[in-house]
Every structure is written in structure tokens, then in C-alpha cells.
A protein has these predicted regions:
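Membrane-proximal helix-loop-helix units in multi-pass membrane proteins
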Residues: 96-145
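Conserved small/polar residues in nucleotide/adenosyl-binding loops
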Residues: 196-197
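Cytoplasmic-side transmembrane-helix entry/capping segments in multi-pass membrane proteins
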Residues: 75-84, 106-108
Length: 198
């Protein structure tokens, strides 16, 4: 029963993070670094954001396998379930929220603040269950172990966040001709979420 409760709390955490993503998308002030690449790819391909999140997260798992090789545990494949669940919740919350957005720049800042709150709350929920890490965190840990063994985990996370954002920016200008989904919120979100965990 306790394990079932942990799964329910874990899924609730993913749902609230996804809800935060939906609010950040509607604010049009930029999504978090984790979701920046899936967002840009979704705009390029015209596919649902949730679908792109799932595919790219599975790509992160494949990179983990290449980096860790035999050190990659079969249990870590559970991240695939996380990828599908989170992708589903992203599409669900986008549907629930629709095109809702508070008017004006101040209203959009409020939307971004709500997004940050939901993301922080969701992360707290799923971390407390000590179940499956999301693929981006798994990739950070894998890179910390194999590529940057002398750096702290948070330093590797910053490197990875910056890398995916830069890739997203390049793809934006190459395929869209303008910057989309990467703005001030892309910087504010990780900083603010980290602060809420202090």
C-alpha cells in the first residue's frame, strides 16, 4: 500500500510539473531549460509538445546507456515510463489550460510565477517518493560520473541546461528564423525553483 501511495504521489508530482510547463508556454515568456529543446522541436515539426518531450527524454536515456554502458542498470529503464507519463501530462494540461493567459506583460509575469510554483511543488512531490528520476536528471548523473567526474552535480546540471538551451536557440534561428520558447522565463525558472528548495 505504501508503494502504491508513493506511485500516486510521484505521478501527482509529474502532473504538477506538467501543469507548470503549460502555464509557462501560455505566458510566452520562455519555458524551462529542460523543456526548451522539446518545445522548439515541437514548433519546428508541428507536433504536440508532449510527444516531443517523450521522444527527446527517451533520447536522453539512450545517451545514458552509451555513457554508462554496463553501469546502466535495467531498473533505470523505468525512466521510459516517466517519459511517457510526463509527455501525456504535458499534453493533458495544455488541453485543460487551453489558450488561457492573463492580459499584458504583468499578467504574463503572473502566469510565469504560477508556472514556477507548480514546477517547484511538483518536483518536491516526486523527489520525496525516491522513485524514478526524470531522464534529464539521469543524464546529468551519467555525465557527472563519466564526462565530468571532478565537478559537482549542480555544476554538471548547469552545463547540460546551457547546452540544451543553446541547441534550442540554434534550431530556432535555423528552422524558424526567430527565437521561440526561450526568453527570460528560461533563466528565471531554474533559478527560482532552486531557491524554493532552500
Amino acid at each position: 500500500m505504501k508503494f502504491v501511495k508513493r506511485i500516486v504521489i510521484y505521478l501527482a508530482g509529474l502532473f504538477f510539473v506538467a501543469l507548470g510547463v503549460a502555464f509557462s508556454v501560455n505566458s510566452n515568456l520562455g519555458v524551462s531549460p529542460v523543456n526548451s529543446l522539446p518545445y522548439v522541436v515541437s514548433r519546428i515539426l508541428g507536433k504536440d509538445l508532449g510527444t516531443c518531450v517523450t521522444v527527446i527524454f527517451i533520447g536522453y536515456i539512450l545517451i545514458q546507456i552509451l555513457l554508462l554502458r554496463k553501469a546502466f542498470r535495467p531498473l533505470d529503464l523505468a525512466q521510459i515510463l516517466c517519459s511517457f507519463a510526463f509527455g501525456y501530462f504535458v499534453d493533458l494540461t495544455e488541453t485543460l489550460l487551453g489558450s488561457f493567459c492573463l492580459p499584458g506583460y504583468p499578467g504574463r509575469l503572473v502566469m510565469l510565477a504560477i508556472s514556477i510554483f507548480f514546477v517547484a511543488f511538483g518536483i518536491c512531490l516526486y523527489l520525496d517518493t525516491d522513485l524514478i528520476v526524470i531522464p534529464m536528471e539521469g543524464l546529468t548523473a551519467a555525465m557527472n560520473k563519466t564526462v565530468f567526474p571532478k565537478k559537482a552535480f549542480h555544476e554538471v546540471k548547469v552545463i547540460l541546461d546551457c547546452t540544451v538551451v543553446v541547441v534550442g536557440i540554434v534550431l530556432c534561428f535555423v528552422f524558424l528564423g526567430e527565437l521561440q520558447g526561450i526568453r527570460e522565463g528560461t533563466v528565471l525558472c531554474p533559478c527560482s525553483v532552486s531557491y524554493t528548495h532552500l
